[in-house]
C-alpha cells in the first residue's frame, strides 16, 4: 500500500484478513445527495423544485381567458456565510427567484389566440441551504433533517391474523396507499362479504365502487366468476363438464357417460377420476334436475314474448324458475361456478348486501359516506368520486407507488399513470379474492422492500409544494378578477405562504432536529439516522413489537445494533456502513458478483426486493487465490434464511465483514465477542463522549477511525496537493502543485481554522494544525485536527492503564476507582463553552438600558465591567457576578415623606429603575472568552459595540491583506519565472521594485503574452481585494435585524474547565459504564514490579454476567500495543541505529496470520522511520476490524514481541501496604470515555424558591430550581423509624403549608427556632377534588 507523507507519520497496524474490495463510501452522502437533487435544476422535472413548479403551474383562471406559466427558477447567493449566520442567529438561506409568464387570451377570438404575454422574475421566499457537512443553520443553530422510513406507496395485501373476530377467523384486506391522496381499503368481514373503505371511514359493500365505475350486476359477475352452462335437452338436464373443476368434490350422483360410470354416488372425486374423464374426452354429463337448485344465475333472463323479467342476475335458481325458463324457450342456462375450496361466492354474496343498483345511487352512497349531513346532488357526487382517485391534482401514486403496484399485481411494465384506472381497482379485488381462496401470500409490512426512505430533499419538496398550492388558489382568484392589462406576474404572487411552509418544516417539524454535536461521531450518526416516527409515520404508542424488531432484510441496510434504549427502541435506526438509497428510495447494499463459482470484484447494489431472488455468501467465506470458494458447502443467506449451499449455487458474496453494522457499531473493537445488548449501549455511549483537552487516538481501534474523522467535517482536509507555505494556530496556507492548478490562478489554498467556538451541546470546537512548514501534502490529507481527532483519526477518549480487581468496595456495582494522576495530567479535562445573552427591550415605561450605573450595587461587583457595563474579555467570573449591567424602568411608586426629603436634598437619584442585570448562574464559574453586541438599526451603538466593530474590521483587513500578500507572492514568483526564462538577469530583477516588473517589454511574443496575462490577474486580484474588504465592512457596520421590541442583545461566552471528579460518568466502548466513586492518591494505587501504578481499577464482576468479553480482549491487545511502544521508546532513548529500529517495527507490522496490510519500511527514508517511531512511542495503534479482528494466538504473539506475559496477567502490589496481591491480575490498556453526564450539571440544592400554583409544593428539577421529592416510599421509611416530628416537618412546613413556612422563615430571621405546622395546601386540593365528585366534606373545629 502506498502512504502519503502525512499518512506515514503514524500507521495503524491492521489485523484484517479479508481484502478490501470496496472503500467505505462518503458517510454523509445520504444528506448531501438528497438535498442536491432538490435544488439542482432537473431538465426532466422529476425531482426537486422543478418538479414542484411543474406540478402546480400553469395556473389557469376559472374562465380560461388567462394563465400564469412557469419558465425557470434560479437560486441567488446567500447574504451571510455559515459562520456569520451562526453568530447573528439568522438562517443560512438563498433567495429563490422564479421567471413566470402571464399569458392573456383574446375573449371573443377563437380559442388559443394570444392577446398579451408578460414575463417577469418573481421573488418566492428564501430556501435554507445545506452546509458542506449536511446540516442547516436555522435561526443561528445547526439542525439536521433526519431521514424517514415510511410505508412505500403501492398496494398491500394483509390479514388480521385472526385477532379481530372472536371466532379466530382470518380476515384478509388490501390497501392502496398513494403518495398523496385518499387511501382505498378492501376488506372481508367474518361473513365473507367484501367491503370497501375510503380514507378509513365507514365501510360500504365493495361492489358500490364497481357500480360507481359504471358496471352492471351482470358485468360484475362476469369479471369475477367462471361459468357453468346447463342445457335442457329432451326434458333432461345436461351440464357442460370441465373435469378439473370437480377435484376434491364428493359426487352427489353417479357421474356416467356413454353408459360407463366414472364416479359412484358418495365417492370423493380424485385426480385419477379426472384423468380418466379427460382421456375419454367427456364434454357433457347428465345431471339430476335437483342438482341445479341453489345455483346462481349469471345474467338476466327475460321472457321475450312478454318482456317480463323471469330471473335477474345473481338470483338463486329453484325448480319453479327452471320450469318457467324452459317454458319461455331458454334452453341454455349460465350459472356461476363456486365451491367451498378455491372459488368462494364472495362477490355474489356482496352484491346481495349492496343497497344500490345503478351508478347514481352508488355515487350518492359514496358521497353520503364522505360528506355526512350534506344533501347530495348528481354533479357534487360525480365530481367527488372523480376527484378521489382519478384526478392528478388530488391523487398521485408516484413513480414508486406505480412500480410497487404493478409488481404486486405481477404486471410486466413498471411505469404507468399516477392515478388509478378501472383495471387497477378490479385487479386488486381479484388478487384479494385469490388470496382468500388460498392462492397467493399476504405481504410482510416490515420487509424493507415495502418501506422506503424519505430524505431531506423529498420532504423539503413536499413542503414547498404545499406552499405553492396555497399560492395557486390566490393566483386563481386574482386571475378571475379581470383588469389583467395592468397586472404583472409580481402582483399575483405572494411569497409569504411558500416561505411560511418551508420555514415551518425546517424550524418545527418533528424530523428537523437540533444537531447532536457532542463529538464528530455523534454528528455523523445523527445525519445517518433513520426514523420511523414523524409526520406520515408511526407513533411511539401505536408501534407494535414487529415494527421494532430486526428483520432479515435489515442485513447490510440498517444496523441491528444501534438504536436507542427506551420507548423509541427499534423505531429509530442507523444506516449501515455501505448502505445507500436507490432511485425509488429503497435501501440497497453492495455485493460482489459470483460468476461460475468465482468471486469477482464486480460490485452490484441490490435492494431488499431483488436480494430475495439470490443466494448470498458471507464475507468471511474462505477463498483461494483465484477467488474460488475453498469449502464445498458455503454458509449463505437466501430468502431471509441462513443455511448451507453448494459453492456453485452461490450468486453473490458480501463485500465486507462490517457491512451489517452502522458507523457507531463499527468503531467497537472485538464487537463479535460482545453481547448484543451491551454492544447497543457501547455504540450509543460513544456518541455521548465529551472531547477531551488533548485528544488521544485509541491504541485498539477498528480502522474506521480515519473515515469518521475525515467525513464528519470537523478536520481541515486538503482540497489539492502541494506544500505547506505558512502555518499558525488559525491559518494554513498551501502552495498548490503545478499539475493541480487551474489555468490562470495564483495556485494558493488558504484554510482558516475554527478556534474555541461553542457546539450545540456546549462542548468546545477547536482546530489545531497537524502539519509543519515545508511538508508536502496530498489531496485528502488531514491538515488540522478538530475536536476529538488525533492526527486525522477519531479519538473520543483516552487510553488508560486498567486493572480488573476489587479494591476495598470502591468499585462495587460498576463504580470506578481513578488515580489522582489522571487528574494531574488533565487526561479527562474538558472545556465547555456557555453562551449567556442579555436582551435590552423597549418596555411600556421606556427602554431598558445597558449601563454600568446600576442602583444599589457596590464597586466590587462592577469591577469586571467596562464603562458600557459589559464584562471584559479574559475576566474570571463565578456564580452571581454581573456580566452585563442592565436597568429596567419601573412604574412610579408612591414616595414616603423621608424619601421626598432625600430626593430634594440630593437631586434625582436613579430610583425609578430596577436592576435587571445578566448574572452568572449559580454553580457556574469560568473565563469570559468572547463578547458580541448586536444593536438594532437606528439605535445608537455604545462604546463597547464600536470597539468590537473596530476590532472586527481590523481583523478582517488583516486577514484579507495577508491573503492578498500570499496570493501576490505566488503571482510574482510566476512572473519572475517568466522574466528569468526570457533572459532577464535575476540580480537586476531583484533590485527593481516588484510593481515595475510588469512594465518590462519582452521580445519573445509568447512570453510577453504570458506576462500580460499575469499583469491582468494582478489587477483583478487587487480589485477583488477592494471588493471583499468593502463587502466585509458593510456587513460589520450594518445594524442587526433583531426581533420586534428588542433594542440590543449582548452575548457573553464563558469557557468552563471541568476536571474529572467523583460522580462523573465514564464508560468503555463495550457498554461497560460506571460512575467514579473516588479519586485515589497515586501512592495508594496498585503497582507492578517496575513500580508503575495503574490508572483505573475496574470491578471484574462487571464482565461475566454482562457477556461483553470484548473489553478483556481489548485490554490484552492494548497492553501488547503499549509494550511495543515501550520497546520503541527504549530504543530511541538509547539512540540505537535506524536499521535496528526499522527491523523491529517491520517485525511488529508483519506479525499475524495472512493479514491484508503490507507495510514496507524499506521504502521509508531514515527520517520518516524516525518520525514514525516518535509517534509510536506511546504505543503502536492497532486496527482489529469488526468480525475480522485479531485472533487469540495473534494477541499472544504480539504480547511476546513486547516482552510481556502471554496470559495478559501480572503480579500487582498494594499501594498502601506494599504487599503482593494473592493472585495475578489482568492489567492492560482500555480506551475509556468521559460521558456528557457530569456531576457539575446534576448537582443541585435549594432552600426556598418557586412553588407549584395548585398544590403550593416546591417545583421539581434543577431547571426549575426545584426541591427534592419526598415520595411515598420515603414517607414509609420515616414511618417505620417512628420519626414523627421529622415526618410532620417534611409534610407541612418543608412542603406546602403556606402559612407555616412563612412563619417559620420569620422565626428563623428573629432567631426563634420554633415551628407551628398548619394545614397542607394539598389537603385542600384533595377536599376540592372530593367535592367535585359531589361529596361535601366540612372541616369542624373541635
From Swiss-Prot:
Keywords: DNA-directed RNA polymerase, Nucleotidyltransferase, Transcription, Transferase. It comes from the Bacteria. Transmembrane segments: none annotated. CDD domains: RNA_pol_B_RPB2. GO terms for cellular component: DNA-directed RNA polymerase complex. GO terms for molecular function: DNA binding; DNA-directed RNA polymerase activity; ribonucleoside binding. The RNAP catalytic core consists of 2 alpha, 1 beta, 1 beta' and 1 omega subunit. When a sigma factor is associated with the core the holoenzyme is formed, which can initiate transcription. Belongs to the RNA polymerase beta chain family. This is DNA-directed RNA polymerase subunit beta. The gene is rpoB.
Amino acid at each position: 500500500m502506498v502512504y502519503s507523507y502525512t499518512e506515514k507519520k503514524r500507521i495503524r497496524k491492521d489485523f484484517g484478513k479479508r481484502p478490501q474490495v470496496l472503500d467505505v463510501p462518503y458517510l454523509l452522502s445520504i444528506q448531501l445527495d438528497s438535498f442536491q437533487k432538490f435544488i439542482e435544476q432537473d431538465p426532466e422535472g422529476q425531482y426537486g423544485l422543478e418538479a414542484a413548479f411543474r406540478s402546480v403551474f400553469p395556473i389557469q383562471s376559472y374562465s380560461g381567458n388567462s394563465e400564469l406559466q412557469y419558465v425557470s427558477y434560479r437560486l441567488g447567493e446567500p447574504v451571510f456565510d455559515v459562520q456569520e449566520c451562526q453568530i447573528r442567529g439568522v438562517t443560512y438561506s438563498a433567495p429563490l427567484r422564479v421567471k413566470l409568464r402571464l399569458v392573456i387570451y383574446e375573449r371573443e377570438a377563437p380559442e388559443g389566440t394570444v392577446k398579451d404575454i408578460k414575463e417577469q422574475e418573481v421573488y418566492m421566499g428564501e430556501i435554507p441551504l445545506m452546509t458542506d457537512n449536511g446540516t442547516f443553520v436555522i435561526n443561528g443553530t445547526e439542525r439536521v433533517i433526519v431521514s424517514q422510513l415510511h410505508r412505500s406507496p403501492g398496494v398491500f395485501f394483509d390479514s388480521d391474523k385472526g385477532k379481530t373476530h372472536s371466532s379466530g377467523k382470518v380476515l384478509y384486506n388490501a390497501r392502496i396507499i398513494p403518495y398523496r391522496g385518499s387511501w382505498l381499503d378492501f376488506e372481508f368481514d367474518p361473513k365473507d362479504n367484501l367491503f370497501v373503505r375510503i380514507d378509513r371511514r365507514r365501510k360500504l359493500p365493495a361492489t358500490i365502487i364497481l357500480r360507481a365505475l359504471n358496471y352492471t350486476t351482470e358485468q360484475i359477475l362476469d369479471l369475477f366468476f367462471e361459468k357453468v352452462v346447463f342445457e335442457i335437452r329432451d326434458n333432461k338436464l345436461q351440464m357442460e363438464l370441465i373435469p378439473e373443476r370437480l377435484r376434491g368434490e364428493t359426487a352427489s350422483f353417479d357421474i356416467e357417460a356413454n353408459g360407463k360410470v366414472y364416479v359412484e354416488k358418495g365417492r370423493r372425486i380424485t385426480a385419477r377420476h379426472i384423468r380418466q374423464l379427460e382421456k375419454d374426452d367427456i364434454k357433457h354429463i347428465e345431471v339430476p334436475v335437483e342438482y341445479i337448485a341453489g345455483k346462481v344465475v349469471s345474467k338476466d333472463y327475460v321472457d321475450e314474448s312478454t318482456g317480463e323479467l323471469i330471473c335477474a342476475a345473481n338470483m338463486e335458481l329453484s325448480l319453479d324458475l327452471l320450469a318457467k325458463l324452459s317454458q319461455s324457450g331458454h334452453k341454455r342456462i349460465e350459472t356461476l361456478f363456486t365451491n367451498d375450496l378455491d372459488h368462494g361466492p364472495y362477490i355474489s354474496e356482496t352484491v346481495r348486501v349492496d343497497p344500490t343498483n345503478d351508478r347514481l345511487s352508488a355515487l350518492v352512497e359514496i358521497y353520503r359516506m364522505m360528506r355526512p349531513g350534506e344533501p347530495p346532488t348528481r354533479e357534487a357526487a360525480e365530481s367527488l368520486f372523480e376527484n378521489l382517485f382519478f384526478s392528478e391534482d388530488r391523487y398521485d401514486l408516484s413513480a414508486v407507488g406505480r412500480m410497487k403496484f404493478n409488481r404486486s399485481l405481477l404486471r410486466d411494465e413498471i411505469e404507468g399513470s399516477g392515478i388509478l384506472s378501472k383495471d387497477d381497482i378490479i385487479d386488486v379485488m381479484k388478487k384479494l379474492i385469490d388470496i382468500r381462496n388460498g392462492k397467493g401470500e399476504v405481504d410482510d409490512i416490515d420487509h424493507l422492500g415495502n418501506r422506503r426512505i424519505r430524505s431531506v430533499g423529498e420532504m423539503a419538496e413536499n413542503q414547498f409544494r404545499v406552499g405553492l398550492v396555497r399560492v395557486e388558489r390566490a393566483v386563481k382568484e386574482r386571475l378571475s378578477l379581470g383588469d389583467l392589462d395592468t397586472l404583472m406576474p409580481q402582483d399575483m404572487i405572494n411569497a409569504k405562504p411558500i416561505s411560511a411552509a418551508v420555514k415551518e418544516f425546517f424550524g418545527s417539524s418533528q424530523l428537523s432536529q437540533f444537531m447532536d454535536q457532542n463529538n464528530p461521531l455523534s454528528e455523523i450518526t445523527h445525519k445517518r439516522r433513520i426514523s420511523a416516527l414523524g409526520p406520515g409515520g408511526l407513533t411511539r404508542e401505536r408501534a407494535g413489537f414487529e415494527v421494532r424488531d430486526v428483520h432479515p432484510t435489515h442485513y447490510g441496510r440498517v444496523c441491528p445494533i444501534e438504536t436507542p434504549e427506551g420507548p423509541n427502541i427499534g423505531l429509530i435506526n442507523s444506516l449501515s456502513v455501505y448502505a445507500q438509497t436507490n432511485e425509488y428510495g429503497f435501501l440497497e447494499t453492495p455485493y460482489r458478483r459470483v460468476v461460475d463459482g468465482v468471486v469477482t470484484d464486480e460490485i452490484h447494489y441490490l435492494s431488499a426486493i431483488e436480494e430475495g431472488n439470490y443466494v448470498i455468501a458471507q464475507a468471511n467465506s474462505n477463498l483461494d487465490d483465484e477467488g474460488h470458494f475453498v469449502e464445498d458447502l458455503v454458509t449463505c443467506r437466501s430468502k431471509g434464511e441462513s443455511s448451507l449451499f453448494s459453492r456453485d449455487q452461490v450468486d453473490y458474496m458480501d463485500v465486507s465483514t462490517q457491512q451489517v453494522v452502522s458507523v457507531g457499531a463499527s468503531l467497537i473493537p472485538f464487537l463479535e465477542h460482545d453481547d448484543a445488548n451491551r454492544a447497543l449501549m457501547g455504540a450509543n455511549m460513544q456518541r455521548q463522549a465529551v472531547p477531551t483537552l488533548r485528544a488521544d487516538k485509541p491504541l485498539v481501534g477498528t480502522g474506521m477511525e480515519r473515515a469518521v474523522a475525515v467525513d464528519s467535517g470537523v478536520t481541515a482536509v486538503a482540497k489539492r496537493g502541494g506544500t505547506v507555505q505558512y502555518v499558525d494556530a488559525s491559518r494554513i496556507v498551501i502552495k498548490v502543485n503545478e499539475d493541480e492548478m487551474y489555468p490562470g490562478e495564483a495556485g494558493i489554498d488558504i484554510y482558516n481554522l475554527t478556534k474555541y467556538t461553542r457546539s450545540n451541546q456546549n462542548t468546545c470546537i477547536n482546530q489545531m494544525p497537524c502539519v509543519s512548514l515545508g511538508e508536502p501534502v496530498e489531496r485528502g490529507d488531514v491538515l488540522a485536527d478538530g475536536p476529538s481527532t488525533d492526527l486525522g483519526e477519531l479519538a473520543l477518549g483516552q487510553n488508560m492503564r486498567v486493572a480488573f480487581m476489587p479494591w476495598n468496595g470502591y468499585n462495587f456495582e460498576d463504580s470506578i476507582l481513578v488515580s489522582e494522576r489522571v487528574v494531574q495530567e488533565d487526561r479527562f479535562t474538558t472545556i465547555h463553552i456557555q453562551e449567556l445573552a442579555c436582551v435590552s427591550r423597549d418596555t411600556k415605561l421606556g427602554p431598558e438600558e445597558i449601563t454600568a450605573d446600576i442602583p444599589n450595587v457596590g464597586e466590587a461587583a462592577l469591577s469586571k465591567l467596562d464603562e458600557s457595563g459589559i464584562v471584559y474579555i479574559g475576566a474570571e467570573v463565578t456564580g452571581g457576578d454581573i456580566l452585563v449591567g442592565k436597568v429596567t424602568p419601573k412604574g412610579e411608586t408612591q414616595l414616603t415623606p423621608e424619601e421626598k426629603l432625600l430626593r430634594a436634598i440630593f437631586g434625582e437619584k436613579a430610583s425609578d429603575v430596577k436592576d435587571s442585570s445578566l448574572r452568572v448562574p449559580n454553580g457556574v464559574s469560568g473565563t469570559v472568552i468572547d463578547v458580541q453586541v448586536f444593536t438594532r438599526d437606528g439605535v445608537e451603538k455604545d462604546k463597547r459595540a464600536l470597539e468590537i466593530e473596530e476590532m472586527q474590521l481590523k481583523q478582517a483587513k488583516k486577514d484579507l491583506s495577508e491573503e492578498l500578500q500570499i496570493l501576490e507572492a505566488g503571482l510574482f514568483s510566476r512572473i519572475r519565472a517568466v522574466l528569468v526564462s526570457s533572459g532577464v538577469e535575476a540580480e537586476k530583477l531583484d533590485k527593481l521594485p516588484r510593481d515595475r516588473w510588469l512594465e518590462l517589454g519582452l521580445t519573445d511574443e509568447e512570453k510577453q503574452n504570458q506576462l500580460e496575462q499575469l499583469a491582468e490577474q494582478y489587477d483583478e486580484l487587487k480589485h477583488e481585494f477592494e471588493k471583499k474588504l468593502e463587502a466585509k465592512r458593510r456587513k460589520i457596520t450594518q445594524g442587526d435585524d433583531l426581533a420586534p421590541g428588542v433594542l440590543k442583545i449582548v452575548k457573553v461566552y464563558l469557557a468552563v474547565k471541568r476536571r474529572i471528579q467523583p460522580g462523573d460518568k465514564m464508560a468503555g466502548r463495550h457498554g461497560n459504564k460506571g460512575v467514579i466513586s473516588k479519586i485515589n492518591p497515586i501512592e495508594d494505587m496498585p503497582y507492578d514490579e517496575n513500580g508503575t501504578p495503574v490508572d483505573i481499577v475496574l470491578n471484574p464482576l462487571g464482565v461475566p454476567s454482562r457477556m461483553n468479553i470484548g473489553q478483556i480482549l481489548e485490554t490484552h491487545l492494548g497492553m501488547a500495543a503499549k509494550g511495543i511502544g515501550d520497546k520503541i521508546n527504549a530504543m530511541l532513548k538509547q539512540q540505537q541505529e535506524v536499521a535496528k529500529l526499522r527491523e523491529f517495527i517491520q517485525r511488529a507490522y508483519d506479525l499475524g496470520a495472512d493479514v491484508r496490510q503490507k507495510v514496507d519500511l524499506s521504502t521509508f527514508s531514515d527520517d520518516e522511520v524516525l518520525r514514525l517511531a516518535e509517534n509510536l512511542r506511546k504505543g503502536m495503534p492497532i486496527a482489529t476490524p469488526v468480525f475480522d479482528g485479531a485472533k487469540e494466538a495473534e494477541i499472544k504473539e504480539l504480547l511476546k514481541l513486547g516482552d510481556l506475559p502471554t496470559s495478559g496477567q501480572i503480579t500487582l502490589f498494594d499501594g498502601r501496604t506494599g504487599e503482593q496481591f494473592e493472585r495475578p491480575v489482568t492489567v492492560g490498556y482500555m480506551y475509556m470515555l468521559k460521558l456528557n453526564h457530569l456531576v457539575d450539571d446534576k448537582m443541585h440544592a435549594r432552600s426556598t424558591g418557586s412553588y407549584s400554583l395548585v398544590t403550593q409544593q416546591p417545583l421539581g428539577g434543577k431547571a426549575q430550581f426545584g426541591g427534592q421529592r419526598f415520595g411515598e416510599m420515603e414517607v414509609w421509611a420515616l414511618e417505620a423509624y417512628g420519626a414523627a416530628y421529622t415526618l410532620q416537618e417534611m409534610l407541612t412546613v418543608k412542603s406546602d403549608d403556606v402559612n407555616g413556612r412563612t412563619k417559620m422563615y420569620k422565626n428563623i430571621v428573629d432567631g426563634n427556632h420554633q415551628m407551628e405546622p398548619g394545614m397542607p395546601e394539598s389537603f385542600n386540593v384533595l377536599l376540592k377534588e372530593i367535592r367535585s365528585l359531589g361529596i361535601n366534606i366540612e372541616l369542624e373545629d373541635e
